[in-house]
Amino acid sequence: MLQDRVASCLEGGIFAAAALRIIGFPALIFDLEAEQDTDHVVAIFKVRGHWGAVAKSNFTGCRYREPVYRGLRELAMSYFNIYFNLRGERTLRRYSRPVNLARFDDLNWMNTEKPIWFIAEHLCEIPHISLLTPAMEKNLIRLDSRTMQGEMVGHRKK
């Protein structure tokens, strides 16, 4: 990632968690799980009892969050309105509990040049908490074109 100067949200979230650890925070990430879309991994931190996040995204609104959220559900919901696929469907459905990357210290996650897919695999295996009821999911409307265009300013196609 550092050599290529390009990162996915997973790599960006892990990198941000490492940076947060270096300045004294626990290296925490959490997974925002989507349907008909890719998940989003963000580094999270707590200041004076409130959660914030550091994230890498090609979408404008899926990045940094100030530490003003009282709980993880509230933080996850801050991504809901602007979490959509290219068909304009709101896709965010679940979030995980925080994962402290210190659990992977014996695998040298911060310094290895080898792939660290074990972190992504762990995120896929842990429970996630639903954000919406089935009735809510059924009644979601698509984003309007202006919102989609605004959120995709600077979007980098793969």
Task: Tell what function each PLM region has.
Residues 1-158:
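A structural boundary/capping signal
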